[in-house]
Amino acid sequence: MNYFEIMDEMFNEFEEYKDIQKGKGIRGKLITIINPNAQKLAAVVESIHLASLLHDDVIDEADMRRGVASINAKYGDHTAVMLGDIVYSRAFYELIDFGKEIAKIVSNAVYLLSQGELEDVKLSNSINLDKEKYMQMIYKKTASLIEAACSAAAVSAGFDKEKFALYGKNIGIAFQIIDDLLDITQDEKTLGKPSMHDYYEGKTTLPYIYLFEKLSENDKEKLMKLYRKKLEKNEKEWIRNKMDEFGIIKICYTEAKELIEKAKNAIKEYNIPALEIIADKVVDRKF
């Protein structure tokens, strides 16, 4: 069985589980490329990611997940939280079978992920222009579990876990930077949610941090007034035009691309073309 089939076997007794949008499964793909025999480990890590999304949608009051109704929108916050707890609990139960080293790697990532969720909530209370704080938050919230997935898979395959951890960390951070960009550059149909939704939710993502550095005082004030506001079409166009004027999208994309090159260089000696392809796809995607 592949890891998605293992997950279905783990959770299919719960009716609500069948309505979850599982997504790309990038963590599972990375694990099974590094070690094709680690399908169960991939299922455990993907389950942890899934549980974090269930909780994340409740925190963000998100009605949509990948273009369809979120579990909290369909069944309510209580059900979404409890389903997330069930998925987390079963994942940790299964994690014990992989031994102490892998269990510590993955459980520490969940600790970091949870910290990242909390930091994200705190940073969303007001405009954050501190790049270091933002980068630390996205490392914890997004990259830490990808880093752990690659590190744990390396342990299971007998590879250098530090090199694969570095690969995972860098593509994880790059993945989030690209997500930040897509929220601005893509439309609702492509994203499966409204465009520029991050700024409405209070998230001052990397493109906005860089834009604030470049704007005149008058334009800074205008951008601040749009914070947490449901943006009109002309307001979205103004933001996009300003991003274009200062080359913000290109700056962020270049930063993500540099992280991808670091990721590929970290594991170059292992010559695993599929991991290079995934790394490149992280930055060359539309959703």
Model-identified regions with their sequence ranges:
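Conserved N-terminal diphosphate/IPP-binding helix and adjacent helical/loop segment
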Residues: 1-73, 120-129, 189-190, 260, ...
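Divalent-cation-assisted or electrostatically stabilized phosphate/pyrophosphate-binding catalytic cores
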Residues: 19, 65-89, 128-142, 189-214, ...
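Residue-level signal for inorganic ion chemistry
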Residues: 30, 91, 116, 208, ...
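Short glycine/serine- and small hydrophobic-enriched flexible loop segments
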Residues: 32-36, 89-97, 151, 155, ...
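Active-site alpha-helical segments that house and flank conserved acidic catalytic motifs
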Residues: 39-63, 111-112, 143, 147, ...
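Transmembrane helix-loop-helix
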Residues: 92-113, 222-229
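Inter-helical turn/loop segments and adjacent helix faces that build the functional surface
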Residues: 93-105, 124-137, 149-164, 184-188
